[in-house]
């Protein structure tokens, strides 16, 4: 698999699902471009492209709650990436282990 085939456009963003390496829980969803993916592989710190700030964002650079990259897999369409990582603290900005888990509707 060639990174240039996945990111045929340097500005293209793909969803990145972050999964706890050990528990397999989903921790968060972010977006990666080619540059943030390369930085993740080089630094072993999960790095996203912030759509609101229009720049790279390494998870934990402000809070210290880094996500340490372990491995990745692309889906069958090569338009979503699953990243396995370990966290150095709460993943969510609300100081929770995961950004997921809030149930608003009970059926």
Question: For each of these PLM feature ranges, what is it?
Answer:
Residues 22-23, 34-37, 78, 88-90:
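Short, charged/polar surface micro-motifs in flexible loops or helix N-caps
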């Amino acid at each position: 698999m060639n990174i240039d085939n996945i990111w045929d456009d340097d500005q293209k963003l793909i969803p990145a699902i972050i999964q706890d390496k050990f528990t397999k829980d989903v921790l968060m969803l972010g977006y990666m471009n080619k540059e943030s993916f390369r930085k993740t592989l080089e630094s072993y710190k999960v790095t996203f492209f912030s759509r609101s700030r229009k720049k790279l964002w390494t998870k934990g650079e402000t809070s210290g709650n880094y996500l340490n990259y372990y491995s990745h897999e692309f889906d069958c369409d090569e338009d979503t990436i699953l990243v396995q990582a370990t966290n150095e603290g709460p993943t969510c900005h609300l100081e929770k282990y995961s950004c997921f888990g809030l149930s608003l509707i009970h059926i």
